[in-house]
Amino acid sequence: MSTTDTIVAQATPPGRGGVGILRVSGRAASEVAHAVLGKLPKPRYADYLPFKDVDGSTLDQGIALYFPGPNSFTGEDVLELQGHGGPVILDLLLKRILALPGLRIARPGEFSERAFLNDKLDLAQAEAIADLIDASSEQAARSAVNSLQGAFSARIHQLVEALTHLRIYVEAAIDFPDEEIDFLSDGKIEGQLNGVMADLEQVRTEARQGSLLREGMKVVIAGRPNAGKSSLLNALAGREAAIVTDIAGTTRDVLREHIHIDGMPLHIIDTAGLREANDEVERIGIERAWNEIEQADRVLFMVDGTTTDATEPAAIWPEFMARLPATLPITVVRNKADITGETLGLTKVNGHSLIRLSARTGEGIDLLRDHLKQSMGFTSNTEGGFLARRRHLQALETAARHLIQGHEQLVSAYAGELLAEELRLAQQSLSEITGEFSSDDLLGRIFSSFCIGK
């Protein structure tokens, strides 16, 4: 579809509401105003007007706002009609506007896409709009606002600027090899490169925090039947999310709870007890449990402390450990400490974390919460932080890899040309974050995930 068309969409959520907003962007916005309002509102002033149908009858009445480009969200002429939030009224008004020549419905995210294409936002800021709408906690919302205001982009621009200066220095060393000073071996370039690498690592650390705030951690509770898995889910959720009985195999399907630990989203998944099952329904539940386990960020291996004194996972259940992915982090949770009399606490056993607690009484649950937060490297202090997506982390990782390779070329071979190429590739990776270097396919995927009216 053409980006020069005039587009229209509902900017408020579908359904009934006190206010419903239609947004128009493009060259024909002023023509829409004359047709529907009978006049062009004064720019950036709220005008209370009737919204007219083609025969002159009134469809609705409300506030009209006109923002001439380039001083608008999209950088184009923008008209907003704020009327009553009934779906029938909004649909009639939308049909009225679409009947005008040159108007079409906006694609998902097209308003934000036009803001990006018209240099009103960079790509990271545009993504922050969607992240702000989807924020599931106060910290995530504040970090999304920081990203929208350019906090993340500013850090990326600082890195790109530092790489630009470094590339100039390296290119000069390559272009003037006959100078008395050997710029590649005098330590200045290496010092600057080390500084950029350190700054990049700091941004990566902050980005990982931002990614945790946005996406959270998927934690699967797994173990044998009647180990207390559902009781642990209820204790973490702070409510009776799962049915708890003394009957083994009560949980037969996957149960999901979304909670927060000091602002970090946590996706807790309770699964069916793992055993050889003859019942078809239970067997399907166990297969689903294994699917969730294999996709988890961490597994809480639930153990009934009254049935074994073992603390090493392989000794507790070797068949379970043999089936787990080798890189999957595990925390052994010895449950029913209120019965066994074990001392509550967190210890390390052969590289695995082990927590003793009572899911029934809630003793030790706070220790588990702190452990989950610390195991992901999450810190509650996100003042000035920003949200980050997986593509941002991948771009930062790629840039770091190119800088490491460039450093090796510098110190081992004084290979200026190869260093310059690695610096260029690192700069290109960073520019993908803000959209200064992005494929059309990438832009399409990003903006298609937005709301229609954004």
From Swiss-Prot:
Q: Which InterPro entries match?
A: G_TrmE, GTP-bd, GTP-bd_TrmE_N, GTPase_MnmE, MnmE_dom2, MnmE_helical, P-loop_NTPase, Small_GTP-bd
* One GO term of the biological process aspect: tRNA methylation
Look up the record and name the cofactor or cofactors this protein needs: K(+)
Q: Which residues bind K(+)?
A: N226, T245, I247, T250
A molecular function GO annotation: metal ion binding
Cofactor binding, per record: Binds 1 potassium ion per subunit.
Ligand binding (Mg(2+)):
S230, T251
Q: Which GO terms describe its cellular component?
A: cytosol
Where are the disulfide bridges?
none
By its UniProt entry, which Gene3D superfamilies does this protein fall under? P-loop containing nucleotide triphosphate hydrolases, Probable tRNA modification gtpase trme, domain 1, tRNA modification GTPase MnmE domain 2
Positions that bind GTP: 226-231, 245-251, 270-273, 335-338, 358-360
Q: Identify which top EC class this enzyme belongs to.
A: hydrolase
- DNA damage is among the record's keywords: no
The record's section on HAMAP family has: GTPase_MnmE
Family that this chain belongs to: Belongs to the TRAFAC class TrmE-Era-EngA-EngB-Septin-like GTPase superfamily. TrmE GTPase family.
> What role is this protein assigned?
Exhibits a very high intrinsic GTPase hydrolysis rate. Involved in the addition of a carboxymethylaminomethyl (cmnm) group at the wobble position (U34) of certain tRNAs, forming tRNA-cmnm(5)s(2)U34.
Its recorded name reads tRNA modification GTPase MnmE
* Organism from which the protein derives: Yersinia pestis (strain Pestoides F)
